[in-house]
């Protein structure tokens, strides 16, 4: 799947058309109050561009939360419609469902240039294809799924996907539009542009930085990246399994992944064969408790971590080593923080790495931060604007880095 060959919204002729845009308005809510409108703001460039082209109607569709395939007012998109109206400076017609005769009639009978927001797609089991009942998975029938997709399609002449965060899901609104023109919006296209640059044509040296607790969860990721990168920094809880297996380091009560430990030698062997340098921490900030009240000290890898203590961040020498490694790379993909950044006294390693990433970005290197925790870190320390690209999709970016195809991207039309 070449990421750079997909149709974008700019390739479409939109005048007089009903334009269906799959957006990601899965915003955090406190009751009916939106606590962060970031995802709505992120979709505005695509929505505004489409409106400037003189469409008949713009139909916006999204999921919100996990209503388990049934209507649940707690997950209504009504508050989003009000917020979008404010941001767009134009009336947004909120429809109380996403399919049905009254929905189709409203869209088809609209004045030119009208904007509609449909109710939560996941109020229908047919969007995800299944729901949980008493802990058991119950599938929607193929006929019902087809009918639901036809209902969505009846609202559209062209389809635009701007929901990168859901691109790894083969849901109806992602892969159900059998229309001649299916394009990526600006947000999705930007994601694809950066990931294709890194994964298909990187400027070298290419560095991957990986954190997270379990090696077993990241096997496919590490394995795929070992075919692409020049060096790889392993931090976070994962580092202890690597240090114990490869260097026989004493790790005290630090996190140890027994299943992952069996694979570490194979990964190290592959790295050696491919000429990829594995960079591990050389010292640690350890604590006698997983809290801000913990007693702490710094130990080197050769000293090891005593029993009753656990490694919760990388130490000052490791920070220096990681910063130098980052400074010498031209393409950097970072997925997972190197320490327990949520606890201030164990956040210095993460802050140092972030500072090095910003510096590299400013010096002209391409720095891509995968979604999830690492994106949270970039937001927390206010550096999103200073990094080449902070991904909006945790699961989707991870699957791309693992070498998997994303159904929502594969489904888009290719440029002729």
From Swiss-Prot:
The protein's name: Phosphoglycerate kinase
Catalytic activity: (2R)-3-phosphoglycerate + ATP = (2R)-3-phospho-glyceroyl phosphate + ADP
GO CC terms of this entry: cytosol; mitochondrion
Binding-site list for AMP: 213-214, 218, 237, 311, 342
UniProt-annotated binding residues for CDP: 212, 217, 236, 336, 341
UniProt binding sites for (2R)-3-phosphoglycerate: 23-26, 38-39, 62-63, 65-66, 121-122, 168-169
Catalytic activity, EC: 2.7.2.3
Annotated positions binding Mg(2+): 213, 216-217, 373
Enzyme class label: transferase
HAMAP family in the cross-refs: Phosphoglyc_kinase (MF_00145)
Cofactor annotation: Mg(2+)
Naturally occurring in which organism (per UniProt): Eremothecium gossypii (strain ATCC 10895 / CBS 109.51 / FGSC 9923 / NRRL Y-1056) (Yeast)
Predominant subcellular localization, coarse grouping: cytoplasm
Function: Catalyzes one of the two ATP producing reactions in the glycolytic pathway via the reversible conversion of 1,3-diphosphoglycerate to 3-phosphoglycerate. Both L- and D- forms of purine and pyrimidine nucleotides can be used as substrates, but the activity is much lower on pyrimidines. Negatively regulates the biosynthesis of acetyl-CoA from pyruvate in the mitochondrion.
């Amino acid at each position: 799947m070449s990421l750079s060959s997909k149709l974008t919204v700019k390739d479409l002729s939109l005048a007089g058309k009903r334009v269906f845009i799959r957006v990601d308005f899965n915003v955090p809510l406190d009751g009916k109050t939106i606590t962060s409108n970031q995802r709505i703001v992120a979709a505005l460039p695509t929505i505004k561009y489409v409106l400037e082209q003189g469409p008949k109607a713009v139909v916006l569709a999204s999921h919100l939360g996990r209503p388990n395939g049934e209507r649940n007012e707690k997950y209504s998109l009504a508050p989003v419609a009000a917020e979008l109206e404010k941001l767009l400076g134009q009336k947004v017609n909120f429809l109380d469902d996403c399919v049905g005769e009254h929905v189709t009639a409203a869209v088809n009978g609209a004045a030119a240039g009208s904007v509609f927001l449909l109710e939560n797609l996941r109020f229908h089991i047919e969007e995800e294809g299944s729901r949980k009942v008493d802990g058991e998975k119950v599938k929607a029938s193929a006929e019902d799924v087809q009918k639901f997709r036809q209902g969505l399609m009846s609202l559209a002449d062209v389809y635009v996907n701007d929901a990168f965060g859901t691109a790894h899901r083969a849901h109806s609104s992602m892969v159900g539009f059998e229309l001649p023109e299916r394009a990526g919006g600006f947000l999705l296209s930007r994601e694809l542009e950066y990931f294709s640059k890194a994964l298909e044509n990187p400027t070298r040296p290419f560095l991957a930085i990986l954190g997270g607790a379990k090696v077993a969860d990241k096997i496919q990721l590490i394995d795929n990246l070992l075919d692409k990168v020049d060096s790889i920094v392993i931090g976070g809880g994962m580092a202890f399994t690597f240090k114990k297996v490869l260097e026989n380091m004493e790790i005290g009560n630090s996190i140890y992944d027994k299943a992952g430990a069996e694979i570490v030698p194979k990964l190290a062997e592959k790295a050696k064969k491919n000429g990829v340098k594995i960079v591990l921490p050389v010292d640690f900030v350890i604590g006698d408790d997983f809290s801000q009240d913990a007693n702490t000290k710094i130990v080197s890898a050769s000293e090891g971590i005593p029993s009753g203590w656990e490694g919760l961040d990388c130490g000052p020498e490791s920070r220096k080593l990681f910063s130098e490694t980052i400074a010498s790379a031209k393409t950097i993909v970072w997925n997972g923080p190197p320490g327990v950044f949520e606890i201030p006294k164990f956040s210095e390693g993460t802050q140092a790495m972030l500072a090095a990433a910003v510096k590299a970005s400013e010096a002209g290197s391409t720095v891509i931060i995968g979604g999830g925790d690492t994106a949270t870190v970039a937001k927390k320390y206010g550096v999103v604007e200073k990094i080449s690209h902070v991904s909006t999709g945790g699961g989707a970016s991870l699957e791309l880095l693992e070498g998997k195809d994303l159904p929502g991207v594969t489904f888009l039309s290719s440029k002729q």
